[in-house]
Amino acid sequence: MPLIYMNIMLAFTISLLGMLVYRSHLMSSLLCLEGMMLSLFIMTTLMTLNTHSLLANIVPITMLVFAACEAAVGLALLVSISNTYGLDYVHNLNLLQC
C-alpha cells in the first residue's frame, strides 16, 4: 500500500478519534467531521484517478457538495445555539426537539 493512502487513512482515523474525544462541543465536532470528509474526498479522488474510470469522476464532486451542505447546516446550528445560550455544547441541541 502506498504511503499516501496510509497518510490519508491516518488522517481519517485521527479525525474520528477527535470526534469521539471532543463530542461535547459542537465546533470541535464540526471541525473533526470536516477533516473526515476531506480525507474521504481525497481518498475517493485518488481511487478514481488510479482506476481511470470516467463514470466515477462525479463521485468526489458529489461528496464535496454534501460536505459543503453539512458544513452550512452545522454552522447555522452553531450560530443559533451560541446566540441563544452563549455556549456551543452539544447537549443544548436536545432543546431544539419538538
From Swiss-Prot:
Supply the gene name.
Answer: MT-ND4L
In short, the EC number is 7.1.1.2
Q: What is this protein called?
A: NADH-ubiquinone oxidoreductase chain 4L
What does the UniProt function comment say about this protein? Core subunit of the mitochondrial membrane respiratory chain NADH dehydrogenase (Complex I) which catalyzes electron transfer from NADH through the respiratory chain, using ubiquinone as an electron acceptor. Part of the enzyme membrane arm which is embedded in the lipid bilayer and involved in proton translocation.
Q: Which GO MF terms are attached to this record?
A: NADH dehydrogenase (ubiquinone) activity
**UniProt catalytic activity:** a ubiquinone + NADH + 5 H(+)(in) = a ubiquinol + NAD(+) + 4 H(+)(out)
Q: Tell me where it mainly resides.
A: mitochondrion
Please give the family membership noted in the entry.
Answer: Belongs to the complex I subunit 4L family.
Source species = Pan paniscus
Judged by the first EC level, this protein's enzyme class is translocase
